[in-house]
Regions:
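Conserved mixed alpha/beta catalytic, RNA-binding, or beta-rich assembly cores of soluble enzyme
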Residues: 106-110, 114, 118-132, 149-272
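Conserved small/polar residues in nucleotide/adenosyl-binding loops
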Residues: 274-277
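Generic N-terminal targeting/processing segments that precede catalytic cores or assembly contacts
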Residues: 1-157, 161-163
Length: 277
């Protein structure tokens, strides 16, 4: 199975390429960055537009053998130079443009009002652009704007509307790598939703393995689905997360077949992981 690369890796690569072309005046058709996982990523650079104090370019997201909705989309970076600075160290300002979401609810990686560019991608962008600044002996200010032309439409197919991220997708990734058929991504989504519910003051986690339980909560009790979390088969991990985040109780609603497994101490309810004798 072939690895892919996250939107964070693509944003860092595009920002590095744009900064390089701006500060050197040379065209860069491919660029290499180091991902947090230690795997180098070499990306083709497209859509190059050069100006006197600004360069923009794009990198096409490659999701590998486990593509998500962002695979094939262009992750763009526009870097603008501003010579103001202390003359000793470069200053980098990172923001999101068209197609990158804005955070409107607490409990996420970024504070309310910020572009939904998570902290690891921000660190990656900073590290890669700082490398270019050192090579070019640049000590001014660079404004880095990350955008995704089709990001607003793509976001409707993600968890972002549910999480209160409006206007586009998030720039994500903790390792820089998209692992094929990774269950870790789903578990991280569960953690994000639980953390957000806790930040908004909830003390009881309303959880369901799937749509059956969510529909039951809504139709029978009129429960607000924005206050519930779908945990798939990862019930044990979800209970642990809720405890770590300080919830005092959990309401677990689902199909009787799933709940019988939990009653028997089976905390991952995937059908391939348990068979009766």
């Amino acid at each position: 199975m072939r690895y892919g690369f996250t939107t964070g890796s693509c944003a860092a690569a595009a920002a590095k390429a744009a900064a390089y072309m701006l500060l050197t005046g040379k065209i860069k058709n491919c660029i290499t960055i180091e991902t947090p996982k230690g795997i180098p990523y070499t990306a083709e650079v497209t859509d190059i537009v050069r100006g006197e104090s600004q360069v923009s370019c794009a990198v096409v997201k490659d999701g590998g053998d486990d593509p998500d909705v962002t695979s094939g989309s262009k992750i763009c970076a526009t870097v603008t130079a501003d010579n103001r600075g202390d003359g000793e160290k470069e200053l980098l300002q990172i923001d999101g443009g068209k197609g990158v979401g804005r955070v409107t609810r607490p409990g996420l990686d970024q504070p309310v009002g910020n572009a939904a560019i998570n902290h690891v991608p921000r660190e990656m962008i900073t590290r890669e652009v700082q490398e270019v600044c050192r090579i070019c002996d640049f000590h001014g200010t660079l404004h880095i704007l990350i955008s995704v032309p089709d990001g607003e439409a793509l976001a409707e197919r993600t968890f972002n509307p549910r999480l209160g991220i409006v206007g586009g997708i998030s720039i994500l990734g903790t390792t820089g790598i998209v692992e094929p058929m990774s269950s870790q991504a789903l578990k991280e989504t569960i953690r994000v939703e639980l953390r957000q519910q806790r930040a908004e003051g909830q003390t009881i986690a309303a959880v369901s393995p799937g749509n059956y339980g969510l529909d039951f909560m809504q139709q029978t009790y009129g429960y607000d689905l924005d206050r519930s979390v779908k945990c798939s088969n990862f019930i044990g991990e979800t209970i642990d997360m809720a405890a770590e985040l300080g919830f005092c109780a959990m309401l677990l609603t689902g199909h009787i077949g799933k709940l019988i497994k939990v009653a028997g101490g089976i905390m991952n309810t995937h059908c391939l992981l348990y068979t009766s004798d």
